[in-house]
């Protein structure tokens, strides 16, 4: 499945602008010159509240279990550790900035690099 997904991701990127969430997109597109990757993290208090309000009452433990699955998937297919700041164009702590402002920050970041 990873090989097929990677092929589709690369085809999408070659055909124009796109946004890839997850699926090791940072790794798959690492050789694309106009590739930007972002990592969003948050502290446990923020994640607990967001799990409660936005994800049908998910507990912090459930969220951390999902994160571990993401990390395992990423490491299995890339041989690298998931979430390492140096792998991303920009990392944002969502506990410190409202999500709409984080989105604005990402847009501005890309605009600055494309200028």
Residue map of PLM features:
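Conserved phosphate-donor/acceptor-positioning beta-strand/loop module used by diverse small-molecule
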Residues: 31-65
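Glycine-rich phosphate-binding loop used to anchor ATP phosphates in small-molecule kinases
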Residues: 1-30
């Amino acid at each position: 499945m990873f090989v097929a997904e990677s092929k589709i991701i690369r085809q999408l990127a070659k055909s124009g602008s796109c946004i890839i969430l997850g699926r090791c997109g940072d790794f798959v597109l690492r050789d694309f010159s106009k590739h930007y990757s972002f990592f969003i993290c948050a502290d446990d208090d923020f994640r607990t509240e967001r799990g409660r309000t936005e994800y049908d009452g998910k507990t912090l433990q459930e969220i951390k279990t999902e994160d571990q699955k993401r990390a395992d998937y990423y490491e299995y297919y890339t041989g690298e550790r998931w979430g390492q700041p140096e792998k991303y164009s920009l990392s944002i702590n969502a506990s410190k900035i409202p999500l709409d402002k984080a989105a604005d920050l990402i847009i501005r970041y890309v605009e600055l690099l494309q200028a």
